[in-house]
From Swiss-Prot:
Alphabetical list of PANTHER family matching this protein: ATP SYNTHASE SUBUNIT ALPHA, MITOCHONDRIAL
Similarity remark: Belongs to the ATPase alpha/beta chains family.
Keywords assigned: ATP synthesis, ATP-binding, Cell inner membrane, Cell membrane, CF(1), Hydrogen ion transport, Ion transport, Membrane, Nucleotide-binding, Translocase, Transport
InterPro entries linked to this entry: ATP_synth_asu-like_sf, ATP_synth_asu_C, ATP_synth_asu_C_sf, ATP_synth_F1_a_nt-bd_dom, ATP_synth_F1_asu, ATPase_a/bsu_AS, ATPase_F1/V1/A1_a/bsu_N, ATPase_F1/V1/A1_a/bsu_N_sf
Main location: membrane
Protein name as catalogued: ATP synthase subunit alpha
NCBIfam families: atpA (TIGR00962), PRK13343.1 (NF009884)
Annotated catalysed reactions: ATP + H2O + 4 H(+)(in) = ADP + phosphate + 5 H(+)(out)
Chain positions of site Required for activity: 372
Length: 512
């Protein structure tokens, strides 16, 4: 058989015609130097600030410093495998993370990659990590309560949906415990809500620079109580590079905004922002940005303000969703006038101030009710709570003032003695064990008992036992009363007050 040149050339032409049409054009640069989680890259002329870039081996980084002859890139991963001369590719996309209901019940890193060994996450969408906060027009005043289940907080420092309430205190004063109790407290509310998404609250917990053992312990507690079903944990632990610790809060907020923007409610806990500021300081100094006060860069206020401004209550036209934030700040030796604490205090809508001294006295949660405030105030309380909680703060403030005086004088008049007795019992009543959040109705009944003199004859050491007995009594013999307070929110007076008094009188007779 003869070789036909024309046929061969036709076949070759056909094959050449379709060859290499999907040629990929990539803008690349070269690594000039690398170390401490920072790479200097030459040649990425058109890169954007905040753009994701890719190193060999799939390691990602973010362009932060755009200089005349090179780009400063922070690396999200191990920089030991990157060497001088490596090629760096632009991805042409700003740092984004997965979002959606599929993330609930999972533990992810700062980029949204699962780290709990439960397989990949089927996220429905991706969201840019660092977006602008909602403007003034889409917002609405905070008016729905966000119950923590803690008597001292819900009665005296109420938090509303869409509020930013700072938890501030020294190390080991129970800051994380308050945040964790708040997550656990949502379980009963979420179960009672059924399919009504407008009542449910989803929780996002961000661990920044913490020990892995601490995060594992927290996840275990959430799994044991079943709270993990409505919670997402984002972990950038102490062993993660500084850029990951810096990014994690923004990434987690983007995941939480998915709920806010779909007319649902979310709570985000940043534990803690002091460590994020330290990570950002490290990055900034390595990028040779000029240092300011306490060696933090000049834009460290903006670092936190742009993050916390994303928590908001949206109005009806924008879905009526909300994002509530509980940022945590660790102080050194009770110094709230340091740089980062004063910054975050000025950004947030109030603070829960925890004191080491109270903690060691056994007053836990160790909330200093005099220094703690909620700038949203009683608009974030139910009517029933508002009517019973009013006198508590005043009585405790008067008690603290008198207690300081009473140390000097021995002959006190009857009114002062009565004030001191009542104050001691109210202080005892505000104590609460960890992992034992109470419902709104239970807190109303307990505080009503405290302010209306039911405890005045009970010895101070028995107040805790008295309260536990009362709660047991209410849960077994007065279920209708608790349901009534929960479902028909109104001031505690008239018929409702009589019902509560009747339940308390019945219990007081039996208590011994």
């Amino acid at each position: 058989m003869g070789i036909q040149a024309a046929e061969i050339s036709a076949i070759l032409k056909e094959q050449i015609k379709n060859f290499g049409q999907q040629a990929e054009v990539a803008e690349v640069g070269r690594v000039l130097s690398v170390g401490d989680g920072i790479a200097r890259v030459h040649g990425l002329d058109n890169v954007q600030a905040g753009e994701m870039v890719e190193f060999p081996g799939g390691i990602r980084g973010m362009a932060l410093n755009l200089e005349v002859d090179n780009v400063g890139v922070v690396i999200f991963g191990d920089d030991r495998s990157i060497k001088e001369g490596d090629t760096v590719k632009r991805t042409k996309s700003i740092v984004d993370v997965p979002a959606g209901d599929a993330l609930l019940g999972r533990v992810v890193d700062g980029l949204g990659n699962p780290i709990d060994g439960k397989g990949p996450i089927a996220a429905t969408e991706r969201r840019v990590a660092d977006v602008k906060a909602p403007g003034i027009i889409p917002r609405k005043g905070v008016h729905e309560p966000m119950a923590t289940g803690l008597k001292s907080v819900d009665a005296m420092i109420p938090i509303g949906r869409g509020q930013r309430e700072l938890i501030i205190g020294d190390r080991q004063t129970g800051k994380t415990a308050i945040a964790l109790d708040t997550i656990l407290n949502q379980k009963s509310y979420n179960e009672a809500a059924g399919d009504d998404e407008s009542k449910k609250l989803y929780c996002i917990y961000v661990a920044i620079g913490q020990k892995r053992s601490t995060v594992a312990q927290l996840v275990k507690k959430l799994e044991e109580t079943g709270a993990i079903d409505y919670t997402l944990v984002v972990a950038a632990t102490a062993s993660d590079p500084a850029p990951m610790q810096f990014l994690a809060p923004y990434a987690a907020t983007a995941m939480a905004e998915y709920f806010r923007d779909n007319g649902r409610h979310a709570l985000i806990i940043y534990d803690d922002l002091s460590k994020q500021a330290v990570a950002y300081r490290q990055m900034s100094l390595l990028l040779r940005r000029p240092p300011g006060r306490e060696a933090y860069p000049g834009d460290v206020f903006y670092l936190h303000s742009r993050l916390l401004e994303r928590s908001a209550k949206l109005n009806k036209d924008h879905g009526a969703g909300s994002l509530t934030a509980l940022p945590i700040i660790e102080t050194q030796g009770g110094d709230v006038s340091a740089f980062i604490p004063t910054n975050v205090i000025s950004i947030t809508d109030g603070q829960i101030f925890l004191e080491t001294e109270l903690f060691y006295q056994g007053i836990r949660p160790a909330v200093n009710t005099g220094l703690s405030v909620s700038r949203v105030g009683s608009s974030a309380q139910t009517d029933a709570m508002k009517s019973v909680a009013g006198p508590v703060k005043l009585e405790l403030a008067q008690y603290r003032e008198m207690a300081a005086f009473a140390q000097f004088g021995s002959d006190l008049d009857a009114a002062t003695q009565q004030l001191l007795n009542r104050g001691a019992r109210l202080t005892e009543l505000m104590k609460q064990p960890q992992y034992a959040p109470l419902t709104n109705a239970e807190i109303v009944c307990v505080i009503f008992a405290g302010t209306k003199g039911y405890l005045d004859k009970v010895p101070v050491k028995d107040v805790g036992r008295w309260e536990q007995g009362l709660l047991k009594h209410l849960r077994t013999n007065a279920k209708d009363l608790l349901a009534d307070i929960t479902n028909n929110d109104r001031k505690v007076k008239g018929e409702l007050e009589d019902k509560i008094r009747a339940a308390l009188d019945t219990y007081a007779k039996d208590f011994a």
